[in-house]
Amino acid sequence: MSNDYIEHYGTKRHSGRYPYGSGEDPYQHEGWSWLARDKKLKEQGFTEKERATMLGCENTSDYRNVKSRYVNEVKAGQIARAKYLVNEKKNTPAKAAEIMGIPLSTLKSYLEPDRENRVNLTQHTAELIKEQVDKDKYVDVGRGTNINLGVTPERLKKAISQLENEGYKVQYVQINQMGTNHKTSIKVLTKDDVDYNTLKDNKYKISTLGGNKIVDENGEIVSTKTEPLKSISSKRIAIRYAEDGGTEKDGIIELRRGVDDISLGKAKYAQVRIAVDGTHYLKGMALYSDNLPDGVDIMFNTNKHKDTPKMDVLKKLKDDPDNPFGATIKGEEDLKMTQRYYTDKNGKRQLSCINVVNEEGDWNSWSKNLASQFLSKQSPVLAKKQLDLDYAEKRAQLDEINSLTNPTIKKKLLESFANDCDSAAVHLKAAALPGQKTHVILPFSSLKDNEIYAPNYQDGTEVVLVRYPHGGVFEIPRLTVNNRKKEPKSVIGNATDAVGINSKVAEQLSGADFDGDTAVVIPLSAGVKIRTSDRLPGLVNFDPKEAYPYREGMKVMTPRYKQIQMGVVSNLITDMTLKGATDKELERAVRHSMVVIDAEKHKLDYTQSKKDNNIDELRRIYQDGGGASTIISRAKSEIKVPARKEFYGISSINTDPKTGKRIITETGEEYVKTKKNKDGTEEKENVKVTQKITAMESVDDAYKLVSSGNYKIEQVYAEYANEMKSLANEARKSYLKTGNLKYSPSARKTYSEEVDSLNKKLKKALSNAPLERQAQLLANQIVDAKLAANPDMDDEHIKKIKGSALITARARVGASKQRIELTDKEWEAIQAGAISENILSSIIDNSDLDSIKKRATPRGADTNLSNAKIALIKSMSSRYTIAEIAERAGVSSSTVTKYLNA
């Protein structure tokens, strides 16, 4: 039999010479046939479950969807036939009813004007969804999306089932849930040719039904996209090139004071993007200047030379109306000091030309930890002190969680704590040093090479600066605070999170520029000693932008590849330092790292840099030709393992109750790999499906990742990682031993009003689920961008930016997530067991966790501290202030004083 065939394109209702359903034999259609078989099986006594299996359905739910679809299809056919017989064949209704063999009343109902629309609602819903999937490729069809279409959840389910039968498919993708350590699972409808990896790579392109639009209170569909950019004319901009001193302020945007459309509001500085002529944009740190030439409102400083045309100095806007700058900008609702809108001289509200990425105050809480790429290059004694302090803090946290009285809340926090400790073992970040803060760096030529303007520190204080990625002690400037300098004082005054340095100091910070680069400032004292050294000779006056400029035909580095290569070269430098590389060898690696840092931003020729600095040779010598070779670099490096089953949460299925260790279960999945031989023949073999995990995740004992050199600093980090693994296991064991909340029917009756109130609050919190998922997607995108800009951000700040990003995202997509606020009486009802554990779990997910935790903590716990917390306070007493200890321990300053004097 031939496999050739002619495929018919069209739809059942719209193709063919005669209307769908107008044929003489109603059983010619598959719907009639299927329903007839179902009816016959039912008459023979088969149950619904048995009929589902016999008719090829996956389960009873699938059976009901198929049946509903065919019932609608048959009914639509009957309506079409009734209209055809009456309107086209000119039969009387009575005659048409006779021909069709149905009662006259039924036929008349078929002729009602909106009857066809009502019957075809599933079909119309399916067509609307199909249209959006064809346009957007990835569409969220999860809980609540039916509201956007004005249909019931059941109708939506049936429409999706119909589309699945037409070749579309439902897939699930998970994203991080902002504010918790949980995942949000998004149900996505795609075409059949979209595999899971493609969906995962494009998760930020998932749209919600309605096409990223929401329905307002009047039923009108309104866009949730950001307002179009307002551009400034290039005629108002001047360029200060390298020959005129632009290099010393590279990345600084000087603004004329008092000009409304470029005002910074109450802020003295901000990291901004400014659209120019609708085609280009400026990016950098904006400051006010009182020394601009007449007719110039903006002066942009660059290290480019005078032969570069003005518009080539600027960057081209990206062809993406939702993200033209390639960076997340703040909306008006997020700004505290920097202007977004202004009122013009006619009293009208106008959009500012200033688009803010970070404003004054945003950098204040960054990097309250010490990354291993810095601390591992310091003394093992200092590293151990800071890692021990981090362990002491986590030990105290676990004791506090174990003291909680509500089992559901306790388990939530134990699970989150275990995940945090597993992550800490991988990332190896230590506690911050006293007075340590991240600041954005700004240039002031009046400062000497050994001076810093730092209003957060006292005059005369000696400090060091650390910038990431960190190459070595030769990249750490040692400076003295001078807050008396007029120039920085007049420009940034008492800046909350900015410091002033000159361009020579910036060069030592691995070639930092001033478009928003940051540095960690660490004050030195008798208890804090940081190793530093002079710059390596081969790095003096090295400018990666001058040494490796763009050349025609070269491969341009992508943002993703930049992150990979930064990790590769950072690991190489770490391993070289531990293994005693020479200064000349370190110069080569660090020069290449400086090129990699700026390669994507300035389109640098990183492949030529790799050749010139012979990076492959360094990897052969210090990494055995492979990748990471010490625990510092190996911990986060990825390895492939057989694919594992994903279990979410903690249970006896995925956790050993005796040890608390995770139980690894392989999926056993395989695929056929075809190998072509030289003679043209093919060989096929079954190969296990793999997945990537970090090396630290793959071992129970961190010492297995220590190099053959067994360096002292490696031992310090291995010990810390094992302590984190032990705490995680302890938390999981405690979770499994913690019982469930006992539900009490009598308590439900006693607290019936409170139960009703809690259910209403929860229903309201869950009512905008689709928009909340869109907000979670957008928030993840914002956080990813922030983490890419500051990969060594500490957990505390990551938590803060997640919260901030979610607020921004909710406002942007129109989601109105409402936190549930509990009354004392409602809490009493919860403690009495008036609601189920599942309901309480949902309430916790939609409440302020700190507030819930406070209610669940035994009275007096804030003053009668655990032994672990007392030990934490005393371990910090010799180097930290009372205020710093109180902040880290989560207690008042008076409580700290009480225990230190005990």
Regions found by a protein language model. Name each.
Residues S2-G23:
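Short acidic, low-complexity intrinsically disordered linear motifs used
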Residues R37, N72-Y84, E88, E116-V491, ...:
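Beta-strand-enriched accessory nucleic-acid recognition/scaffold domains that flank the catalytic cores
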Residues Q44-F46, N91, G580:
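Charged, low-complexity interaction regions
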